[in-house]
Regions:
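Positively charged n-region of N-terminal signal peptides that target proteins for export
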Residues: 1-4
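Bacterial N-terminal signal peptides
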Residues: 6-14
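A beta-rich soluble binding module of mature secreted/lumenal proteins
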Residues: 17-177
Length: 177
Protein backbone atom coordinates (compact mmCIF):
# COMPACT_ATOMS: atom_id res chain seq x y z
CA UNK A 1 0.00 0.00 0.00
CA UNK A 2 2.79 2.44 0.93
CA UNK A 3 4.57 1.63 -2.31
CA UNK A 4 1.43 2.45 -4.31
CA UNK A 5 1.13 5.81 -2.55
CA UNK A 6 4.77 6.63 -3.35
CA UNK A 7 4.29 5.66 -7.01
CA UNK A 8 1.11 7.74 -7.29
CA UNK A 9 2.69 10.78 -5.62
CA UNK A 10 5.81 10.50 -7.77
CA UNK A 11 3.70 10.21 -10.92
CA UNK A 12 1.66 13.23 -9.90
CA UNK A 13 4.77 15.29 -9.23
CA UNK A 14 6.35 14.29 -12.53
CA UNK A 15 3.28 14.76 -14.70
CA UNK A 16 1.26 17.26 -12.66
CA UNK A 17 4.11 19.75 -12.36
CA UNK A 18 5.48 19.19 -15.84
CA UNK A 19 6.91 22.19 -17.62
CA UNK A 20 5.69 20.99 -21.02
CA UNK A 21 2.85 23.31 -22.00
CA UNK A 22 -0.13 21.65 -23.63
CA UNK A 23 -2.69 24.35 -24.47
CA UNK A 24 -6.11 23.24 -25.73
CA UNK A 25 -6.53 26.40 -27.84
CA UNK A 26 -4.18 28.41 -30.07
CA UNK A 27 -1.79 30.80 -28.32
CA UNK A 28 -0.94 34.22 -29.75
CA UNK A 29 2.51 34.60 -31.30
CA UNK A 30 3.24 38.28 -30.59
CA UNK A 31 3.12 39.44 -26.99
CA UNK A 32 4.72 42.14 -24.83
CA UNK A 33 4.49 41.17 -21.16
CA UNK A 34 5.01 44.74 -19.93
CA UNK A 35 1.88 45.87 -21.79
CA UNK A 36 -0.09 43.12 -20.03
CA UNK A 37 0.80 44.29 -16.52
CA UNK A 38 -1.72 46.13 -14.38
CA UNK A 39 -5.36 45.65 -13.48
CA UNK A 40 -7.84 43.53 -15.47
CA UNK A 41 -11.53 42.87 -14.84
CA UNK A 42 -12.81 39.32 -15.14
CA UNK A 43 -15.77 39.41 -17.56
CA UNK A 44 -16.47 35.72 -18.25
CA UNK A 45 -15.21 32.51 -16.66
CA UNK A 46 -15.96 28.84 -16.37
CA UNK A 47 -17.17 27.70 -12.93
CA UNK A 48 -14.61 26.36 -10.46
CA UNK A 49 -14.46 26.04 -6.70
CA UNK A 50 -11.80 28.69 -6.10
CA UNK A 51 -14.06 31.44 -7.53
CA UNK A 52 -17.42 30.10 -6.42
CA UNK A 53 -19.75 32.91 -5.34
CA UNK A 54 -17.32 35.67 -6.33
CA UNK A 55 -18.35 38.77 -8.26
CA UNK A 56 -16.47 41.98 -9.12
CA UNK A 57 -13.38 39.84 -9.74
CA UNK A 58 -10.15 41.54 -10.79
CA UNK A 59 -6.63 40.35 -11.50
CA UNK A 60 -3.57 42.52 -11.14
CA UNK A 61 -0.21 41.59 -12.64
CA UNK A 62 3.14 43.00 -11.45
CA UNK A 63 6.58 42.19 -12.84
CA UNK A 64 9.10 40.82 -10.33
CA UNK A 65 12.85 41.44 -10.57
CA UNK A 66 13.45 37.81 -11.58
CA UNK A 67 11.11 38.01 -14.60
CA UNK A 68 8.21 36.22 -12.94
CA UNK A 69 4.88 37.94 -12.48
CA UNK A 70 3.03 38.42 -9.21
CA UNK A 71 -0.69 37.77 -9.64
CA UNK A 72 -3.23 39.26 -7.22
CA UNK A 73 -6.79 38.04 -7.72
CA UNK A 74 -9.56 39.76 -5.80
CA UNK A 75 -13.30 39.14 -5.72
CA UNK A 76 -16.31 39.95 -3.61
CA UNK A 77 -17.99 36.97 -1.94
CA UNK A 78 -21.69 37.77 -2.00
CA UNK A 79 -22.72 35.20 0.64
CA UNK A 80 -20.04 36.22 3.15
CA UNK A 81 -20.26 39.92 2.35
CA UNK A 82 -16.49 40.31 2.14
CA UNK A 83 -13.59 40.57 -0.27
CA UNK A 84 -11.35 37.56 -0.91
CA UNK A 85 -7.79 37.87 -2.20
CA UNK A 86 -5.38 35.26 -3.56
CA UNK A 87 -1.76 35.98 -4.45
CA UNK A 88 0.14 33.78 -6.87
CA UNK A 89 3.11 33.76 -9.20
CA UNK A 90 3.42 33.17 -12.93
CA UNK A 91 6.55 31.87 -14.65
CA UNK A 92 6.94 32.42 -18.39
CA UNK A 93 7.30 29.17 -20.36
CA UNK A 94 6.96 30.61 -23.87
CA UNK A 95 5.47 33.53 -25.76
CA UNK A 96 2.16 34.41 -24.04
CA UNK A 97 2.43 31.16 -22.04
CA UNK A 98 2.80 30.93 -18.26
CA UNK A 99 2.74 28.42 -15.45
CA UNK A 100 0.75 29.94 -12.57
CA UNK A 101 0.69 28.80 -8.97
CA UNK A 102 -1.33 29.96 -6.02
CA UNK A 103 -0.27 26.94 -3.97
CA UNK A 104 3.24 25.61 -4.64
CA UNK A 105 4.13 23.08 -6.07
CA UNK A 106 0.90 22.97 -8.07
CA UNK A 107 0.97 24.90 -11.34
CA UNK A 108 -1.63 25.45 -14.02
CA UNK A 109 -1.23 26.54 -17.62
CA UNK A 110 -2.16 30.15 -18.40
CA UNK A 111 -2.18 30.82 -22.12
CA UNK A 112 -3.18 34.00 -23.90
CA UNK A 113 -5.23 32.86 -26.87
CA UNK A 114 -6.44 36.26 -27.98
CA UNK A 115 -5.51 39.88 -27.30
CA UNK A 116 -7.39 42.90 -28.53
CA UNK A 117 -5.95 46.40 -28.46
CA UNK A 118 -7.52 49.81 -28.13
CA UNK A 119 -6.88 52.80 -30.41
CA UNK A 120 -3.72 53.66 -28.46
CA UNK A 121 -2.32 50.15 -29.05
CA UNK A 122 -2.72 49.09 -25.42
CA UNK A 123 -4.04 45.63 -24.57
CA UNK A 124 -7.74 46.01 -23.78
CA UNK A 125 -9.27 42.48 -23.88
CA UNK A 126 -7.58 39.14 -23.25
CA UNK A 127 -8.85 35.59 -23.70
CA UNK A 128 -7.12 33.11 -21.40
CA UNK A 129 -7.14 29.34 -21.90
CA UNK A 130 -5.34 26.49 -20.18
CA UNK A 131 -4.26 22.85 -20.38
CA UNK A 132 -7.86 21.64 -20.19
CA UNK A 133 -11.33 22.74 -21.14
CA UNK A 134 -12.06 23.39 -17.45
CA UNK A 135 -10.47 26.85 -17.46
CA UNK A 136 -11.34 29.88 -19.58
CA UNK A 137 -11.43 33.60 -18.84
CA UNK A 138 -12.23 36.80 -20.69
CA UNK A 139 -10.45 39.75 -19.10
CA UNK A 140 -10.87 43.44 -19.89
CA UNK A 141 -9.25 46.68 -18.80
CA UNK A 142 -12.78 47.98 -18.17
CA UNK A 143 -15.67 46.32 -16.29
CA UNK A 144 -17.85 46.22 -19.41
CA UNK A 145 -17.30 44.69 -22.84
CA UNK A 146 -19.64 45.29 -25.79
CA UNK A 147 -22.00 42.35 -26.43
CA UNK A 148 -20.91 41.98 -30.06
CA UNK A 149 -17.29 41.57 -28.92
CA UNK A 150 -18.28 38.93 -26.34
CA UNK A 151 -20.38 37.13 -28.96
CA UNK A 152 -17.35 36.85 -31.24
CA UNK A 153 -15.18 35.59 -28.39
CA UNK A 154 -17.79 32.95 -27.47
CA UNK A 155 -17.91 31.77 -31.09
CA UNK A 156 -14.13 31.33 -31.03
CA UNK A 157 -14.32 29.51 -27.69
CA UNK A 158 -16.83 27.06 -29.18
CA UNK A 159 -14.60 26.52 -32.21
CA UNK A 160 -11.77 25.64 -29.80
CA UNK A 161 -13.98 23.04 -28.09
CA UNK A 162 -15.27 24.95 -25.04
CA UNK A 163 -18.84 24.49 -23.81
CA UNK A 164 -19.93 28.13 -23.64
CA UNK A 165 -23.26 27.21 -22.02
CA UNK A 166 -21.30 26.68 -18.78
CA UNK A 167 -19.69 30.12 -18.80
CA UNK A 168 -20.47 32.64 -16.06
CA UNK A 169 -20.81 36.39 -16.65
CA UNK A 170 -19.14 38.26 -13.81
CA UNK A 171 -21.13 41.10 -12.25
CA UNK A 172 -19.19 44.34 -11.74
CA UNK A 173 -22.08 46.55 -10.67
CA UNK A 174 -21.55 48.78 -7.66
CA UNK A 175 -23.20 47.86 -4.39
CA UNK A 176 -21.00 44.96 -3.32
CA UNK A 177 -18.66 47.24 -1.30
Amino acid sequence: MNRLIVVLLTSFLIFGCSSNPTPVAPVIEKFEATKYLGKWYEIVRLPHSFEEGLQRVTAEYRLNDDGTIEVTNRGYNIELGEWETAIGHAKPVGTAMYKVTFFWPFYGGYYISELQTNDAGDYSIAVITSDSYDYFWVLSRTPKVPENVLDEIMKKAESWGYDTSLMIRVNHQAGYQ
